[in-house]
């Protein structure tokens, strides 16, 4: 699995249209609030041209991309943290995701109602962020009450956790984001179990009309806000994505060329998600399968091996490694070996994006 991204936004911003396009799940995308009731989940293959290039050389029995999971959360409204709209249940669903994709409406269309009666991306973002902060505030206050008793009895872990929660409490009281608080590695690890919503990496998916990727004041405003937060912005046109999703691969290429677009918005969303979560891809390439795997940037070879199977990490001996560019240039493993580009790496090796790897292990 690549990662799980919860798609949030106000009702009628294009959330479900985008989700349908990304996953071809075909859930209802009606023009009225709350048409998403249970969270819909879709697993999407990660588009990566490198995988096809490797497969052309190796000619395997099958090709397996890595994947990304999208969860379409019902449209949030002001008061969701207090049970308004469809309430707390949906905030709980977001907690289970690794990142948040916040869909923001950056287009005008009189036929599609806006829940607030006007198009104002800054206001929309504030509404959602406030609800997420209020939900975190509730969790934080309850955790503080629980921890105070343990901290008084001398529990060191409880004292440490309490000190972190007391640091983030005033930020949440002002509807701020926990991710704006400077927390070190140990502090982040200590509060990981709370799954705080405002700590999750966030990207803004700006839903625009097909002719308003440029010179769009709504999009400019989202970019301005995202820059202040250190968040990523991905402009897409959900309506175009919905059309692309219905086409065969060859038709897609022609359709994109006609529109002057290089690739579907899905690719941009996934790449942004990868950057957001500090992820990268490595490959395994054999006659049975050529496959992409997702690991964290900075992962060691044994950690990369564990993605395939935990036994690979436990019994790790060495990793055979060829850089992707070398594998392509020298037409596979044998050519790379002859060119001196095949190498053996130990347990401290830091995996690089695109590495073609084979693990030696003994259990």
From Swiss-Prot:
Is Magnesium set as a keyword in this record?
yes
Q: Belongs to which family? A: Belongs to the TRAFAC class OBG-HflX-like GTPase superfamily. OBG GTPase family. YchF/OLA1 subfamily.
Q: What is this protein called?
A: Ribosome-binding ATPase YchF
Q: Which UniProt keywords apply?
A: ATP-binding, Magnesium, Metal-binding, Nucleotide-binding
Q: Which residues form the OBG-type G domain?
A: 3-256
* Keyword ATP-binding found: yes
Question: Entry's SUPFAM superfamilies?
Answer: P-loop containing nucleoside triphosphate hydrolases (SSF52540), TGS-like (SSF81271)
Q: Which Gene3D superfamilies match?
A: 3.10.20.30, P-loop containing nucleotide triphosphate hydrolases, TGS-like domain
Superkingdom of origin = Bacteria
**Which residues does the record give as ATP binding sites?**
12-17
Q: Which InterPro entries match?
A: ATPase_YchF/OLA1, Beta-grasp_dom_sf, G_OBG, GTP-bd, P-loop_NTPase, TGS, TGS-like, TGS-like_dom_sf
Organism of derivation: Haemophilus ducreyi (strain 35000HP / ATCC 700724)
Q: GO CC annotation: what is one?
A: cytoplasm
In what residue span(s) does the TGS domain sit?
278-361
Gene Ontology molecular functions: ATP binding; ATP hydrolysis activity; GTP binding; metal ion binding; ribosomal large subunit binding
- Name its co-factor(s): Mg(2+)
Instruction: State its role.
Output: ATPase that binds to both the 70S ribosome and the 50S ribosomal subunit in a nucleotide-independent manner.
Cite the binding residues for Mg(2+). 16, 36
| Pfam families according to UniProt | MMR_HSR1, YchF-GTPase_C
């Amino acid at each position: 699995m690549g990662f799980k991204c919860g798609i949030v936004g106000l009702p009628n911003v294009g959330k479900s249209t985008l989700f349908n396009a990304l996953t071809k799940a075909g859930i209802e995308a009606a023009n009225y609030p709350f048409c998403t009731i249970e969270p819909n989940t879709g697993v999407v293959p990660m588009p990566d041209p490198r995988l096809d290039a490797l497969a052309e050389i190796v000619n395997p029995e099958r090709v397996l991309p890595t994947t990304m999971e999208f969860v379409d959360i019902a449209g949030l409204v002001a008061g969701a943290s207090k049970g308004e709209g469809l309430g707390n249940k949906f905030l709980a669903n977001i907690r289970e995701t690794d990142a948040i994709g916040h869909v923001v409406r950056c287009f005008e269309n009189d036929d599609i109602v806006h829940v607030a009666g006007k198009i104002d991306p800054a206001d929309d973002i504030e509404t959602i962020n406030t609800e997420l902060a209020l939900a975190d505030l509730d969790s934080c206050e309850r955790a503080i009450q629980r921890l105070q008793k343990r901290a008084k009895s001398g529990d060191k872990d409880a004292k440490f956790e309490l000190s972190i929660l007391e640091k983030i409490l005033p930020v949440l009281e002002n509807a701020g984001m926990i991710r704006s608080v400077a927390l070190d590695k140990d502090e982040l690890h200590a509060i990981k179990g709370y799954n705080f919503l405002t700590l999750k990496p966030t990207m803004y998916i700006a839903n625009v009309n097909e002719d308003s990727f440029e010179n769009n004041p709504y999009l400019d405003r989202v970019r301005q806000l995202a820059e202040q937060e250190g968040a990523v912005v991905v402009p897409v046109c959900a309506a175009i994505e919905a059309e692309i999703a219905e086409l065969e691969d060859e038709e897609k290429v022609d359709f994109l060329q006609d529109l002057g677009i290089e690739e579907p918005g899905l690719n941009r969303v996934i790449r942004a998600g990868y950057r957001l979560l500090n992820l990268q891809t490595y490959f395994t390439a054999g006659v049975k399968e050529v496959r992409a795997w997702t690991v964290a940037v900075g992962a060691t070879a044994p950690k990369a091996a564990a993605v395939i199977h935990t036994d690979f990490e436990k019994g790790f001996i060495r990793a055979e490694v060829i850089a992707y560019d070398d594998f392509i240039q020298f037409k596979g493993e044998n050519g790379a070996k002859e060119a001196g580009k095949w190498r053996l790496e130990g347990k401290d090796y830091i995996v690089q994006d695109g590495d073609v790897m084979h693990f030696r292990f003994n259990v």
